[in-house]
Regions:
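Positively charged n-region of N-terminal signal peptides that target proteins for export
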Residues: 1-4
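Bacterial N-terminal signal peptides
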Residues: 7-16
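Boundary at the C-terminal end of the N-terminal hydrophobic targeting segment
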Residues: 19-21
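N-terminal secretory signal peptides
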Residues: 23-69
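Envelope-exposed proteins and targeting segments
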Residues: 24, 33, 96-98, 132-134
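Well-ordered alpha/beta subsegment
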Residues: 27, 112-142
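Mature extracytoplasmic domains of secretory-pathway proteins
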Residues: 51-96
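Beta-strand-rich cores of mature extracytoplasmic or soluble domains
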Residues: 93-120
Length: 142
């Protein structure tokens, strides 16, 4: 019994809030199209989500993503990765932008580090129909 208690306590201590983190549902509006997604329970994601509703003028790039500058600079932007998964919503500290990645390409490696803050859970095919520049709004359902 002591071993079981120790194993549970040990797991909780090292797992912490990360293992039990909850995602928050987010609405992503592109013109008349409404998509669903989630925002992760991280310091950076929550810092950005505190600014919702947030409209970002985004540009399509490389047949794989939309990205655009945000009007504030988050403080919790440490780390990052040079790859993405389809559906990732990311923040890039290098150029202070949000991005939505929707399609792997023949060049899946990135030149700037991005930090995932959420993901689109709707069908990503919608992004292939959008124009070269779109106003994308992130908000929470009321």
């Amino acid at each position: 019994m002591k071993k079981l208690f120790f194993a549970i306590a040990f797991g909780f201590f090292f797992c912490g809030a990360f293992c039990f983190a909850e995602e928050r549902a987010v609405k992503i509006s592109v013109g008349d199209v409404e998509l669903e997604g989630v925002i992760f329970d991280t310091a950076l994601a929550e810092e950005i989500a505190a600014k919702f509703p947030l409209s970002v003028s985004m540009v399509g790039f490389g047949g794989r993503e939309y990205y655009g500058a945000i009007p504030f600079t988050p403080k919790n932007a440490d780390g990052g990765q040079l790859r993405f998964d389809d559906g990732d919503i990311t923040y890039c500290a290098t150029n202070n932008t949000l991005a939505i990645f929707y399609a792997q390409t023949d060049r899946p490696n990135l030149t700037m580090r991005v930090i995932p803050i959420g993901r689109v859970t709707s069908d990503l095919a919608a992004f292939k129909k959008f124009g070269a520049r779109e106003k994308i709004t992130f908000s929470f359902e009321k």
